[in-house]
Amino acid sequence: MKINEIREPIQKRSIEKKEKIIKAGFELICEKGYYNTNTAEIARAAGVSTGIVYQYFKDKHDILVEGIKRYASDIFYPMLNVTSNIKIDKNNLDFILRNMINAFVENHKLSQIAHEEIMSMTHSDKEIAEFFQENEMAMTKNISKILLDNGFDSKNLYEKVHIAIHLIDDLCHEIVYHKHKDLDYDIMINLVIENILNFI
């Protein structure tokens, strides 16, 4: 193998080793910050040598990107799970939106430190920013397809769904991160749902 040639693991043990590096590296970066974490620390946390890390990853940025791919799936796709397995119509959309908001809030709580670190990096790292933009659009299209399959109006649906996603995302950020004491979150949830129902 050439120096600095990146391996793609095939055997189960090697795959597990790579996954351990991703998990350990991602958790460390989210805990300490990207610029306060080095590859040697990631190797120690994963229980491997630094050389092993460099067999699978060019640098800690590659580890972070792989971690973000897993984190993004955990954050985005629970919202889709709420909608994908049941019949949706105007009569039960209120109920579905409440479940979606609850799922989104819980995922933000579970990944609060990770979310804060990653969101800060979307402003300075083009690759990470592009990854999140692509995921947002993919989620918009997936939810739009689910609504279309259930008979909802197709007119401006991508735009409507994208606005709805951001309303829910902003609401979750308020509940999990900002926590303004003068705001009633039950009222805010009702207002978000009411507005989404009005334009979907």
Annotated model-derived regions:
Residues E16, K20, L28-D62, E66:
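Helix-turn-helix
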Residues E41, N91-I96:
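A conserved beta-strand->loop->alpha-helix hinge within the catalytic CA
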Residues T83-S84, V105-E127, H173-H178:
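Amphipathic alpha-helical segments used for helix-helix packing
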Residues K2-I6, T50, H61, G67-Y71, ...:
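Alpha-helical bundle regulatory/interaction domains
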Residues M1-E16:
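N-terminal intrinsically disordered/low-complexity leader segments
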Residues I21-I29, F104, I168:
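Short hydrophobic clusters on alpha-helical segments that form packing/core surfaces
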Residues S73-N81, F95, N102, E106-L110, ...:
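Amphipathic alpha-helical packing segments from all-alpha helical-bundle domains
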Residues E116, L148-N195:
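Hydrophobic/aromatic-rich alpha-helical bundle segments in the mid-to-C-terminal region
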